[in-house]
């Protein structure tokens, strides 16, 4: 006899699809994350163990009553979604286990066998969400990258066309950075969608979000705690990506509806990461460099899928990984577009990558950055015996100006943002400085504000008052002049592998100066220390920040990933104790006492470790603020309080502040010197295994609105500043050459 | 050819009011046994099932089975144009892409008809199995609506706990907690005011207030409401429509977590 208890809701259409539906074990899916199982089910009698919390104890008396009683009622239960995809019977069981336990971080992970979506060839979003979840719980950077590479490897092997969306979703981008396509969904909109989908109240969600500090988690909890009548079809990576792009492009009510419809289909941790993607913060600590490394490792794993276990690959094929990573990073720095790179790595040999992904005008390449020095002496120490050139370091905005064969001009910022719309005046007069036949070019330059009457450079603050968008050429008040200092591409030829002296020669051949509009950066080729010193003083008089020092012939190419010899910058304030000020992130606040009651009295500052992608404490600070400053900081930071330290903050418990902040603001800080500290964690492991570096007598200088927290001073730079102190140098004779990648001004 | 005629437009109005908050659009499945509608709300948390038997209509004719996808908002607009006492007739040709709704005043002096475009909705049809419920509670519909409305002020979810003694609705939130207990009525004088509990096993389940309050929009249709519950199974809230059929709402329970 068919017991009513074992029945459950099912799609009527299923009956026709599957002539004899196998007996399924109905059960309510507590986590709503089994894509292939009945989600809701009927009553007792099922072999499933009922969650105890949900049942009240049943007295024997009641039990006996139970049997004869028959209030025949229909009940609801749901069934499997697509009969055609995953089988309902035994395979359903297997896949269920795989889905729930999908874990690309295990040592035994096999990119093929454990890719449970093999037969479908469509990467489920849940697999990606699971990967993110595991990565979020992982501490070590290498392990995180390895986990991601396992997932990527599976995608490459099983569903390669999903690799592009998977990669974009992993770094939470919708398109190459320079296209500037951003989601921009307000948190309240998301909250409303969550309310609608789970029957909750907006006020409750708001207060819970405030408490937990992450709408993603709130969304997941809300999702998981409300069962559904019928689970919509599982999401897959490419649809999610496509929908996110749609969401970014539309506005108004329909945006909210799209979010809502997607959210309804989210299960378990999908809800968390979907919402985080929409907010714009994935919080898994994977950024561009880690991602490229993970891709490289995945490629190597793919090549050696039969040779050995995936977990062994990183050890056995170390060299191949290093080589692949370099090739990939090189290609990415000249062609920062995954839409081009990823199909290329899937189709061609990695060694051909550079030819397959050439640079071309209209697509920004990563700019060469400079590292700070303390003085002329240090420059000569570092560049000893090489031919060098010094250029004035203009105080303006870095600009990469592109012109393609069709004559279209685009202008990109230091961070590869498209600034073309900001400078219609430059585009209007862009013909003037060409000399001879120039069809296409990429130049590297600095745009500075220009006083037309007095013919002189104006400070950066003037430039920053220019409108950013919808600039009307008639209404421009701040005139600009472009100082060109490098040429990276001319008439279809990339010049990045040429030396600076050659590039400069070509620059002078093809371009000419136009007074007040286009100028070449004032330069001096000299190896005389006194001349450099004098040139520096001249540059300061010429309203410049200082000098940029570059090698002319040796290691003088423009290849970022290959680590061409870095440029150095010499700044006018190098005379102070520490060569440069530090730009540090405020991550915590201590409540003020006495006169400072009601505001924060001190703050906890951190530098950013780009390798580990974490913030490491470097000092507490309480001086250099006026009362007004404190008021302003307290108000601003008060809006960014989070309930607990971020997982990517490294600090000693003894430093626990009263309030933790989101890493939202960067301050310029000066200090007397740097010393090793048992409690601070800056650059820990670089200079000393146990101790970090801290600042002595830090003073607040100003807020660096132009930098975001990830552009703060890097741990390597801190280590380098520490080591280049005379005192330290005398102690340890063999100072290691620190390699620094990031700029620091 | 499909044709269905009801003596009073007011019933159809009330039915529309009872479902249009949950559903934006739905398919009316017509056969010679009557009209069926079954649809989940957008969030897939609740399900509405409406049955109108052919014998409840003044006139009912359905030559071939017909599925009519309708925008319920538009349908409600059309019904607003009817007087409560009007006769109402729904008509459609086989394979038509429109439905005609006609109102006739009681004295036959005014006849208005409205033609509405149909939609092609590919909604999932769910088979609803029969279940032995642990608890079935019958109570006055007004009372249930009142309880849901009151408790929603305290929390976003309501706990319904049914035991031998009676049924208890409770909610707790920032303000505090609210408990409403109903005992089984001793002697039944007026059937519509009775609270009747049939229980085999005690049940405690948690539901989102938002949906319960949406269900109570059906209160004008019926004096009594029937709640059927069983652990881990959706709640069924049924309103009988006198002589015509019933409307049932299914609601997936919430998973109680310890924090709330």
From Swiss-Prot, chain B:
<keyword id="KW-0238">DNA-binding</keyword>
<dbReference type="GO" id="GO:0006289">
    <property type="term" value="P:nucleotide-excision repair"/>
</dbReference>
<dbReference type="InterPro" id="IPR046938">
    <property type="entry name" value="DNA_clamp_sf"/>
</dbReference>
<dbReference type="InterPro" id="IPR000730">
    <property type="entry name" value="Pr_cel_nuc_antig"/>
</dbReference>
<dbReference type="Pfam" id="PF00705">
    <property type="entry name" value="PCNA_N"/>
</dbReference>
<dbReference type="GO" id="GO:0006260">
    <property type="term" value="P:DNA replication"/>
</dbReference>
<feature type="DNA-binding region">
    <location>
        <begin position="61"/>
        <end position="80"/>
    </location>
</feature>
<comment type="similarity">
    <text>Belongs to the PCNA family.</text>
</comment>
<dbReference type="GO" id="GO:0007307">
    <property type="term" value="P:eggshell chorion gene amplification"/>
</dbReference>
<dbReference type="GO" id="GO:0030337">
    <property type="term" value="F:DNA polymerase processivity factor activity"/>
</dbReference>
<dbReference type="GO" id="GO:0045739">
    <property type="term" value="P:positive regulation of DNA repair"/>
</dbReference>
<dbReference type="Pfam" id="PF02747">
    <property type="entry name" value="PCNA_C"/>
</dbReference>
<dbReference type="InterPro" id="IPR022659">
    <property type="entry name" value="Pr_cel_nuc_antig_CS"/>
</dbReference>
<dbReference type="GO" id="GO:0006298">
    <property type="term" value="P:mismatch repair"/>
</dbReference>
<dbReference type="GO" id="GO:0042542">
    <property type="term" value="P:response to hydrogen peroxide"/>
</dbReference>
<keyword id="KW-0963">Cytoplasm</keyword>
<dbReference type="GO" id="GO:0003677">
    <property type="term" value="F:DNA binding"/>
</dbReference>
<comment type="function">
    <text>Likely to be an auxiliary protein of DNA polymerase delta complex and is probably involved in the control of DNA replication and repair by increasing the polymerase's processibility.</text>
</comment>
<keyword id="KW-0158">Chromosome</keyword>
<dbReference type="GO" id="GO:0007052">
    <property type="term" value="P:mitotic spindle organization"/>
</dbReference>
<comment type="subunit">
    <text>Homotrimer. Forms a complex with activator 1 heteropentamer in the presence of ATP. Interacts with E2f. Interacts with the catalytic subunits of two DNA polymerase complexes: PolD1 from the delta complex and PolE1/DNApol-epsilon255 from the epsilon complex.</text>
</comment>
<dbReference type="GO" id="GO:0006272">
    <property type="term" value="P:leading strand elongation"/>
</dbReference>
<dbReference type="GO" id="GO:0072702">
    <property type="term" value="P:response to methyl methanesulfonate"/>
</dbReference>
<keyword id="KW-0235">DNA replication</keyword>
<dbReference type="GO" id="GO:0000785">
    <property type="term" value="C:chromatin"/>
</dbReference>
<dbReference type="GO" id="GO:0019985">
    <property type="term" value="P:translesion synthesis"/>
</dbReference>
<dbReference type="GO" id="GO:0006974">
    <property type="term" value="P:DNA damage response"/>
</dbReference>
<dbReference type="GO" id="GO:0045740">
    <property type="term" value="P:positive regulation of DNA replication"/>
</dbReference>
<dbReference type="InterPro" id="IPR022648">
    <property type="entry name" value="Pr_cel_nuc_antig_N"/>
</dbReference>
<dbReference type="GO" id="GO:0043596">
    <property type="term" value="C:nuclear replication fork"/>
</dbReference>
<dbReference type="GO" id="GO:0009411">
    <property type="term" value="P:response to UV"/>
</dbReference>
<protein>
    <recommendedName>
        <fullName>Proliferating cell nuclear antigen</fullName>
    </recommendedName>
</protein>
<dbReference type="GO" id="GO:0005634">
    <property type="term" value="C:nucleus"/>
</dbReference>
<dbReference type="GO" id="GO:0043626">
    <property type="term" value="C:PCNA complex"/>
</dbReference>
<dbReference type="InterPro" id="IPR022649">
    <property type="entry name" value="Pr_cel_nuc_antig_C"/>
</dbReference>
<dbReference type="GO" id="GO:0006261">
    <property type="term" value="P:DNA-templated DNA replication"/>
</dbReference>
<dbReference type="GO" id="GO:0005737">
    <property type="term" value="C:cytoplasm"/>
</dbReference>
<dbReference type="GO" id="GO:0003682">
    <property type="term" value="F:chromatin binding"/>
</dbReference>
<keyword id="KW-0539">Nucleus</keyword>
